[in-house]
């Protein structure tokens, strides 16, 4: 029986069929110092169709609106209770990309922090976004795009996706640039995305082959030191050539990832299993609850109608037959061997752990 796990693993094998081929260095590593910066701000969304915060329960929304109106020259009488339904307090986040200059735009994500029912159709008012140094780097404003939809009537409601979060494409303008220092005295450091001595050494070898011996040196299993031109104006062209070099990826470490919460099992193509015998019995618990109604036999008496729950619990354990798993070095063969057990992905969690303990699973087992 081909279980859904098998289809997923076979698809991953087909997608990774070319894993042994060369890849661009820019897909395997990043330049040290070239990074984005997280920004955050607090703002107000207006124009909601009665789906905003209930100001009696979210006092910060009313306070924020009063402060904003005061800055615009509008005085709100002290102690007044504004009954507003079209305003919502939100948190706004964005990522300032490297080398961003004033005047450029970035996307922002808007999330409700009160009890608003929906942000659909709202407009974010001018909101400054600050970095970790408490300096303002971008100003966000614009109409929200909310991917969800919902409707309610007569006590019933239907909702598709999330309504309390939205996005504004190019909704923030950069006001301050972040200096990006990635080269000092012509020295650049490349950081591999994954720690692997083989792939790191292959990358250093490819750079030396292109630009001459001594240009690159692997410092450890993740960082490569590259000697570039001393002239800063020549560094962008040099790094462009470095990023587009073809590097052979070393075979990955055999690994099986298990998500105990969802029952997902993912393995790479280097996983091997040794010959073993596996028996796994299925334990099932069935709970059946029915409400029985008892009424008085004769009408017009003092008896009352009583509802009595009747609960039945049944525990069933099916005997597991001993199955032989043959030695397999190919991912497709591993999938076939596991399918022969007739186990569901949830059962495979226990089976793979037992095979690892018995030494039959030649892979690192990681539970997330």
UniProtKB/Swiss-Prot annotation:
Summary of subunit composition and partner proteins: The basal body constitutes a major portion of the flagellar organelle and consists of four rings (L,P,S, and M) mounted on a central rod.
Signal as UniProt keyword: yes
Organism: Bordetella pertussis (strain Tohama I / ATCC BAA-589 / NCTC 13251)
Keywords: Bacterial flagellum, Periplasm, Signal
Keyword Signal: yes
Protein name (database record): Flagellar P-ring protein
Similarity annotation: Belongs to the FlgI family.
InterPro entries: Flag_FlgI (IPR001782)
Localization per Swiss-Prot or TrEMBL: Periplasm; Bacterial flagellum basal body
């Amino acid at each position: 029986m081909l279980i859904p796990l098998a289809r997923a693993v076979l698809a991953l094998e087909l997608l990774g069929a070319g894993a042994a081929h060369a890849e661009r260095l820019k897909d395997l590593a990043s330049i040290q110092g070239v990074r984005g910066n997280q920004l955050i701000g607090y703002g107000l969304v207006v124009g909601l169709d009665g789906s905003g915060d209930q100001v009696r329960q979210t006092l910060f929304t009313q306070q924020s609106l009063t402060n904003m109106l005061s800055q615009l020259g509008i005085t709100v009488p002290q102690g007044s209770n504004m009954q507003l339904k079209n305003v919502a307090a939100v948190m706004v986040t964005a990522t300032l990309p490297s080398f961003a200059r004033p005047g450029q735009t970035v996307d922002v994500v808007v999330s409700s922090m009160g009890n608003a029912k929906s942000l659909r159709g709202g407009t974010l008012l001018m909101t400054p976004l600050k970095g970790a140094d408490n300096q303002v780097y971008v100003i966000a404003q614009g109409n929200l795009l909310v991917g969800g939809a919902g409707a309610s009537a007569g006590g019933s409601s239907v909702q598709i996706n999330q309504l309390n979060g939205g996005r504004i494409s190019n909704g923030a303008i950069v006001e301050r640039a972040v200096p990006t220092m990635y080269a000092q005295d012509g020295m650049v450091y490349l950081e591999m995305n994954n720690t692997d001595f083989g792939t790191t050494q292959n990358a250093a070898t490819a750079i030396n082959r292109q630009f001459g011996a001594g240009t690159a040196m692997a410092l450890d299993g993740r960082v490569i030191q590259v000697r570039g031109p001393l002239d800063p104006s020549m560094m962008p062209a040099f790094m462009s050539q470095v990023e587009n070099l073809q590097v052979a990826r070393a075979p990955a470490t055999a690994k099986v990832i298990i998500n105990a919460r969802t029952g997902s099992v993912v393995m790479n193509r280097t996983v091997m299993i040794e010959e073993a015998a596996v028996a796994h019995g299925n334990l099932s618990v069935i709970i059946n609850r029915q409400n029985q109604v008892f009424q008085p036999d004769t009408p017009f008496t003092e008896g009352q109608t009583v509802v009595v729950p009747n609960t039945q619990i049944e525990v069933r354990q099916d005997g597991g037959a001993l199955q032989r798993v043959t030695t397999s070095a190919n991912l497709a063969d591993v999938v076939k061997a596991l399918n022969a057990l007739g186990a569901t992905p949830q059962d495979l969690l226990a089976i793979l752990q037992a095979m690892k303990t018995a030494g039959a699973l030649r892979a690192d087992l990681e539970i997330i």
